[in-house]
Structures are given as structure tokens and as C-alpha cells.
Regions:
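Disordered, acidic Ser/Thr/Pro-rich linker "stalks" and the adjacent N-terminal cap
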Residues: 112-176, 189-196, 265-269
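Active-site-proximal alpha-helical
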Residues: 622-811
């Protein structure tokens, strides 16, 4: 084997001055170590330790790779190259001949870092870049300044440049003296905003000496902030200019932070020793002599391990399925900004600071694949939003050998992100990935036994570990999993734990109608540990502080003893399913997601719903009408409407806000128009009562799928003919109105043309550009109309009694300031429209006593389920 040049490094094993002595002074310990630990890097070397002693002595190592040889005045220790991705240790024992004195030195050799010697691909810059349109301050030159925080953007505002098939944004990069371009990276804006992300773009190339452009293909990309790569089948040689025509961009804009033109730096000559293109095995007949001829340190390291049978491809080499993107499902479910798993390709690979070599194959030409490295622990532990949040570093991957440089100080776990933004994931072949120098952390999954998983958590390299169930991908501390993940009977319970979490999501998806209406995703949702706060809906999913792991990892606690933990998990996942504003109106952000919480604790077999007493008290408030008779209850929401009335542009609605000056809540029997609104009930838990009682009653009275149907109806709201769940035929008036208020100008135009005499049309109550924060009322009326059709009854009396429809103005602080503005004429028209459905025979009038029966209806209990382990 070809050896690196060795060197001599001396360590005096004594606390005395570094002078060689044959005999130590009387009373001095015969063998003293000045240092008990020594760390070296992965490269081969020979160490020498000077030993000064007044007795005869021996030296031995407990590992074969540390070879010791006595010298005249010490010991040589030969350490070969460490070809593994993990560090290794050996203990050197120095013993006196009589056995009475022993000193030890721990020698640690670092992991193989051959990838550090690999050159990274280079970028070449365009000499000039131009665009056919630019927003002032967002010039085309920003696409070649090397700064991801700056970007080029098409014009917006009054002079908006609308990107379309017939009006593409065109950017042209001119080159001078560039010989070769192997691939191009399109880097979208990195400020978290998706406006302008390229969604459909054509690349055209003009070579030196040519007069025209040649198309290199049209690419369809998801709008998700990830870097997109274009790699032509052959390098582009001597380019004169490269042009991009953007036919579709997010929000009808076009935006680019950087366009990187890259040249590969890796030669592939020595990689032909492998039998496959993923470099996971040597060709038959490869020998030590062949190994000695290799010069590429990475190839040499990998080949050495394979030749000696010490290299395992477990976790390091795997295939990763394509998934429909989280954004695709968010749009499909009308749940904007609420995302399922954004790091679906769990690898089990631990990434430390430095360079890493990754081979990737089979990325389709029109797709992009990224590697995300998430450091779940970043060295800071707090409890009141003062801890450390996960740090994500993202790398664009391409087919072939990728060299990434991970510069973050804290290690992370690696995830392959391979998503289709158009719902066509099933037609995509998997990509294959090999982390050549990856350190294995492993992950827990249903194909492993509990004993296998227990061993993984015990030997984890990373602070955290992934748990991959059928429905839920979660990340917890490795120590927490090892110590707290117990089954109901107290045994190791990883498999049962996955089944519990999977059941919670299955139940939520059932309530939402995903199974009934074929909306089940091919993507998991997420839960993860954090170091900053008790519980919240974070950037990846539901998150619990790590000090809560003894609760949320214990199956007996979840299933039998801790209804609150079930509520919390379901509550935060419920946020992912919230349909804003269709079923998430002003003041509803912490209410409608709790429909999922309620359903799941019932399905888990808990016999007392979390807020049963609150709902009983709410029923008394609604039915007995005593609480607000004193005239002393002031509505903060109405008060804020009055104080901020100048935010309302419509003259009549501004007058409504002005009329809220005294903000007093009245008793329903005295003034129903100014009675309590459901957003003004004592708490969000009380406000949920009206929904729960309605759901439970009709589930047991002829509408077993009431929730499934109303959710699907809302998902179909924006279809050309609206929902076909509760009705057949054309779009409903209030479906149009709801869509218009959300910002759909075409629906607003259709509404005005179809209903010219409506108060909404005549008084211009809707301004689509203002968005739904400007008024939740259209969404509320739309939902009441839908559920009335589903039940077969005109439900206006019930929802009026519960305060869903009041001719008042409210400005509700609910993750932003949201308005509720219902004028008298809006309410009157809605009641007339609902009465018309009764007159036509489509709906029935609620019989006497039904309102009270619904309001007082009990909970729906289930038998406690069992979960296999």
C-alpha cells in the first residue's frame, strides 16, 4: 500500500523537565503521564513517545491498528490511515515490569476526511446580464453578484409586468472567454417569500459564432425556495449567451436571486473501479495492487474499506421515492401555508462540519432534488422561546458526484428532498443516493424490531433521531427515545409508539374526509422536539420541548393517562389542516383546529371531553341569556373596531365600525343584534362548543359524515361549479362571494354579473385586493349555507343564537388583525336567501326544540383502541 510520509512526535511521559534520564530521583513515581489523551487526524503516521523511567517497563495497545515497537528511549506507535467515516480509539498501557505501576494514554484517530481534499465545482460569471423588465431597485445585475439576499424582480404595483405564455419575462446572460458550462443553478429569492419563483421556464443557448438561439428544454418547477439545477446531456462549449424565458412565475411575477453557471471540477477516471454508477461495490478482480495505484484519496479510502470488507452501505446508499410536495397538498386542501413533511427523505446520516461526498443518480431532467441538513440541537437550551431553533442548511444536488461543504458548527441529520409540485409523484422513478463518507446515525422504522431500534438509540451519534411511521415522521432526542419510549405494558415500545401517532393522524384525516374523498396524501406529517418552548406549531410540524418527552414518548401515558398530550398533538396537527379562511375565520385560529383534538380524544377512548364543563357553561350562556343582562360586559373586539375604524375603506362599513363606540354586549332577549358573538365567549374553548355540539348531534341524526362532507365542500369551493357535495349544478352565490373576498377578481366579476341587485354588489362591500383579513363574514355565511344543505335544515336560527351572525363590527387580534363586518342589509339578504331554499323545498325549518337539543347534546364516545407493538 502506498504510505504517506510519516513524522515523529515526542511526548514525555513524566512531569519532570524534558531531559532524558535513566534513573529518576528517589520517591518519584516510576511512570508519570504528562497527558492522558491525544487526538490525531485520519492520515497514516508514526508517533514516538519518549519514556523516562527508573524501572523496566512494557507498552501495549488494545487495538491491532495501533502497532507498538520499543525504541532505545521510548516507544514507536504506527497508526495506519483511518478509512472509516467514524473516529476510532486505542488505549496505550505503560506498565512497570513488576506490574505495580500502570499509566494509560487514550489515542483517538479522527474519521476519514478524504472528501476535504476534493475540489469543489467552480462558477463562471456572465460579463453582462439584461432583462426585458425589472422593478426599480431589483436590477438584473443582482443575478450575478454572488449575494443570495439580493434579487432581480419584474415590476409590480401600478406598473406590474404580468408574466404569461404570451408575455414572458426574458433574462439574457452574455459570456466572454468562457470555454465550458456543465450545469446551471437557478437560486430563487431566499427571504421566505415565493412571489416570482420560476414555475415554467425555457432555456435557450447561443454559442460563439452562431447567430441564433437553440432551445435546451422547458422546465416545470415547484415554487418552494429550493435551488433548481439544469444539467444538459453534454457540456455547453464556448457559450456566447444563455437566455431564459419565464412563462409562468408565482404570483405572475418572475424573480431570481442568483443564476449560477458551473463547471465540474471532478475527474472520473478512477471511479471506473466500481461495478455500479453509485460506487457501492468494486469490480470483480480488484486487488491490493490496484489499490496501491490510486491517487484520489476519496476513491482510495472507499476502495480500501470495500476490499477489506469493512464498508457497509446500510443507510449510506439508498433509493428515495418522489413525493407530492407539501405545497401541492396545502393547495389541494385549501389550507394555505400549512405544510406536511418538508424533509421526507430520511437518510439516517449524521453530517458534521466539513466536506462530504455524495453520489446521486436518476434525477429527472425536469426535476430538482435538494439535500437539507437539519441541526436539531444548536447548543442552546431554553424554555420561554429563548432556546435554540433548528438550523437548516440546503444544498442543490445533481446527477453524479456532489461535494458539499457543511460550514455550520453543530452537526445535523441529512434529508433528501425530492418533490413533485404538480401531483405527479407516482409517475416519478426514485433517485439513488450514496453518502460516501457519511456517518451512520440510523433511524427508527416499522421494518425493524424493538430490540434493533433500542440498540440504535443507545448507539446514536447525533443528539436526535428520526422515527419514521406510516403517517408520521417525528424527531426526538436519541436519549429520550431510549429512556422513555415504552409500550403500555412498560416494555420497549417503539413500534407501538409509531402506531399511536399514526392512528392520531389517520383519525384526523378521516374526520377531514380525506379517505372518503380520496384526498389521502403520499406524504407524512411531522412532530419534533425543540429546545425553546413547551409546545407549538413550528416550521416543521407539531413541536414539544425535550423536557416533555417523558410524556409524549410513553404509550401508556398517551393512551391511558394524558388526554392533554393527545389534545396537544392533535391541536397542532389541526393547524396543518386549517382551511383559511373557509373554516378559519377571524378569531378562529385556535378554535377550528380543535375539532381534530376533540375527535381524537374521543377516538382514544377518553370518557370526558377536555372542555365538557366549558361547553356546558357555554350552553347555559347561550340558552339562559343571563350573563349579559347587567350591561357591564364590554367587547374588546368591538372596541378595537371603533378605535381602528379608519382602516375600513368602505363608507357604510366604516360607519358600522363607528357605531361600536360603547362596545357593550347585550342580552339576546333584549337586543339580539348586539348580543354576544361566538368570538366574544369567555375563551376559545367555550367558542368550540357550538361546533362540537352541532357535529355530535347531526352525526347521530342522519348525517354520519357531516364533518367529512363540510370539509370536502369547502375544498371544492373554488371549482368552476363550486362544491358538488351538498348540491348539484352551478356555483352558489355565497361560494362566489367567499372566493371574491379571498382575492379572486374573476369570481367577484362573476358575482356582480350574476347578482347585480345584491347589497354586496350595490354597496361594493367586497374589495378582492384587500383579502379575507378585511372581512370574514362571506366565509361564515358560505359555511352556514353549506352545512344547512348537508343537514337538510335552515340552520340560521342555531348559528344566530350562538353568535355566528351579528350585525356588528369586530377587529379581532388573531395572528394578525382580522375584521368581522356584517351590516344589517347583509344579514337580511342572507336570511332571505336561506328562506328561499326553504320555500323551494330544498331545506326544512328547524322544528321546535331542535336548537336546544343540539346545544345540549352530549359527547360521542368510542371504545379505547389497542395498538400492536
Amino acid at each position: 500500500m502506498k504510505k504517506s510520509v510519516s513524522f515523529i512526535w515526542a511526548l514525555l511521559l513524566s512531569s519532570l523537565p524534558a531531559a532524558a534520564q535513566d534513573v529518576l530521583p528517589q520517591g518519584v513515581t516510576p511512570l508519570l503521564l504528562a497527558a492522558h489523551n491525544q487526538t490525531i487526524d485520519y492520515q497514516e503516521r508514526t508517533l514516538h513517545f519518549d519514556v523516562t523511567a527508573n524501572v523496566d517497563w512494557t507498552c501495549s495497545a488494545d487495538q491491532e491498528w495501533a502497532q507498538t515497537t520499543r525504541s532505545t528511549n521510548g516507544v514507536f506507535v504506527h497508526v495506519p490511515t483511518n478509512y472509516a467515516s467514524e473516529s476510532r480509539t486505542a488505549t496505550l498501557s505503560f506498565k512497570s515490569a513488576d506490574g505495580h505501576t500502570t499509566q494509560e494514554l487514550l489515542l483517538t484517530q479522527g474519521p476519514n476526511n478524504a472528501a476535504a481534499n476534493l475540489p469543489e465545482d467552480k462558477t463562471v460569471k456572465a460579463s453582462v446580464v439584461t432583462a426585458n423588465n425589472s422593478q426599480s431597485g431589483s436590477a438584473a445585475s443582482n443575478m450575478r453578484d454572488g449575494d443570495y439576499s439580493t434579487f432581480w424582480h419584474t415590476a409590480y404595483g401600478n406598473n406590474k409586468f404580468v408574466v404569461s405564455e404570451s408575455n414572458p419575462a426574458i433574462i439574457t446572460f452574455s459570456f466572454n472567454g468562457v470555454e465550458r458550462i456543465d450545469y446551471i443553478n437557478y437560486v430563487p429569492r431566499q427571504d421566505g417569500t415565493r412571489n416570482g419563483d420560476f414555475k415554467r421556464v425555457e432555456m435557450l443557448v447561443q454559442l460563439q459564432g452562431e447567430s441564433g438561439y437553440k432551445s435546451y428544454g422547458t422546465f416545470v418547477w415547484a415554487s418552494n425556495g429550493a435551488t433548481k439545477s439544469i444539467e444538459p446531456s453534454e457540456p455547453i462549449l464556448n457559450p456566447k449567451s444563455i437566455q431564459f424565458k419565464v412563462y409562468e412565475g408565482d404570483g405572475d411575477f418572475a424573480c431570481c436571486a442568483e443564476m449560477e453557471f458551473c463547471v465540474k471540477s471532478q475527474g472520473n477516471a478512477e471511479y471506473d473501479i466500481f461495478s455500479d454508477d453509485l460506487y457501492t461495490a468494486l469490480k470483480p478482480g480488484f486487488t491490493q495492487a490496484d489499490l496501491d495505484l490510486l491517487t484520489n484519496p476519496l476513491v482510495q479510502s472507499l476502495a480500501y474499506q470495500m476490499l477489506n470488507g469493512t464498508y457497509s452501505t446500510a443507510y449510506r446508499a439508498a433509493s428515495y421515492e418522489c413525493h407530492n410536495s407539501p405545497q401541492y397538498y396545502s393547495n389541494l386542501w385549501n389550507a394555505p401555508g400549512k405544510y406536511y413533511d418538508q424533509i421526507a427523505g430520511v437518510t439516517g446520516i449524521h453530517i458534521e462540519k466539513g466536506k462530504h461526498a455524495i453520489v446521486v443518480r436518476d434525477i429527472p431532467a425536469d426535476m430538482s432534488v435538494t439535500l437539507k441538513v437539519v441541526a436539531w440541537y444548536v447548543g442552546k437550551d431554553g424554555g420561554n422561546f429563548d432556546g435554540g431553533n433548528p438550523n437548516t442548511t440546503e444544498f442543490s444536488l445533481r446527477n453524479g458526484l456532489n461535494v458539499i461543504n457543511y460550514t455550520y458548527d453543530w452537526p445535523g441529520l441529512a434529508y433528501i428532498c425530492y418533490y413533485d409540485g404538480n401531483g405527479n409523484s407516482s409517475s416519478r422513478a426514485p433517485v439513488r443516493v450514496h453518502f460516501i463518507n457519511g456517518v451512520v446515525n440510523g433511524y427508527l422504522s416499522r421494518d425493524k424490531s424493538n430490540d434493533e431500534m433500542h440498540e440504535l438509540t443507545e448507539n446514536a451519534v447525533n443528539t436526535c433521531m428520526d422515527v419514521v411511521g406510516e403517517k408520521v415522521h417525528s424527531v426526538w432526542t436519541s436519549k429520550g427515545l431510549h429512556n422513555y419510549c415504552k409500550s403500555i405494558d412498560g416494555k420497549v415500545g417503539y413500534r407501538q409508539y409509531m402506531n399511536v401517532l399514526d392512528s392520531l393522524i389517520t383519525w384526523e384525516q378521516d374526520l377531514l374526509g380525506f379517505y372518503k374523498y380520496d384526498r389521502v396524501p403520499d406524504l407524512r406529517t411531522m412532530a419534533y422536539t425543540n429546545y425553546t418552548y413547551y409546545m407549538f406549531q413550528g416550521g416543521f410540524g407539531v413541536s414539544f420541548h425535550h423536557d416533555q418527552e417523558r410524556r409524549v414518548l410513553n404509550c401508556n401515558t398517551l393512551v391511558n393517562n394524558d388526554e392533554d398530550a393527545i389534545w396537544g398533538l392533535s391541536h397542532e396537527w389541526g393547524h396543518q389542516h386549517q382551511m383559511a379562511p373557509y373554516f378559519n375565520w377571524a378569531g378562529m385560529s385556535e378554535i377550528t383546529n380543535n375539532m381534530n383534538s376533540y375527535y381524537n380524544i374521543m377516538r382514544m377512548g377518553y370518557k370526558n371531553s377536555r372542555d365538557a364543563n366549558n361547553w356546558k357553561n357555554t350552553a347555559k350562556i347561550i340558552l339562559n341569556d343571563d350573563t349579559y343582562k347587567d350591561g357591564k360586559h364590554v367587547s374588546e373586539h368591538r372596541k378595537q373596531a371603533y378605535l381602528n375604524r379608519n382602516e375600513v375603506s368602505n363608507v357604510k362599513l366604516k360607519a358600522l365600525a363607528t357605531s361600536m363606540k360603547d362596545s357593550i354586549i347585550h342580552a339576546y332577549s333584549e337586543n339580539p343584534d348586539l348580543a354576544v358573538a361566538f368570538q366574544e365567549l369567555p375563551s376559545v374553548d367555550h367558542s368550540l362548543g357550538g361546533f362540537v355540539r352541532f357535529y355530535c348531534y347531526f352525526r347521530d341524526h342522519g348525517c354520519p359524515d357531516i364533518a367529512k362532507d363540510w370539509y370536502e365542500s369547502l375544498r371544492q369551493n373554488n371549482n368552476a361549479n363550486g362544491s358538488q357535495v351538498e348540491k348539484k349544478g352551478g356555483v352558489d352565490k355565497y361560494e362566489l362571494l367567499c372566493s371574491a373576498q379571498i382575492g379572486d377578481n374573476a369570481k367577484w366579476t362573476e358575482f356582480k354579473q350574476s347578482y347585480p341587485q345584491s347589497v354586496w354588489t350595490k354597496n361594493s362591500y367586497v374589495t378582492p385586493s384587500a383579502g379575507w383579513y378585511a372581512n370574514s363574514v362571506p366565509a361564515i355565511l358560505n359555511w352556514i349555507r353549506k352545512v344547512s344543505r348537508l343537514t337538510g335544515y335552515n340552520m340560521v336560527p342555531y348559528f344566530e343564537k350562538w353568535g355566528f351572525i351579528r350585525p356588528i363590527a369586530m377587529r379581532v387580534g388573531d395572528y394578525g388583525n382580522k375584521w368581522y363586518l356584517m351590516s344589517e342589509d347583509m344579514l337580511s339578504e342572507f336570511k332571505e336567501d336561506m328562506d328561499a331554499l326553504v320555500d323551494s323545498g330544498e331545506l326544512k325549518v328547524m322544528p321546535e326544540g331542535m336548537l336546544e337539543d343540539i346545544t345540549n347534546y352530549g359527547d360521542k364516545y368510542f371504545t379505547r383502541p389497542t395498538f400492536p407493538n
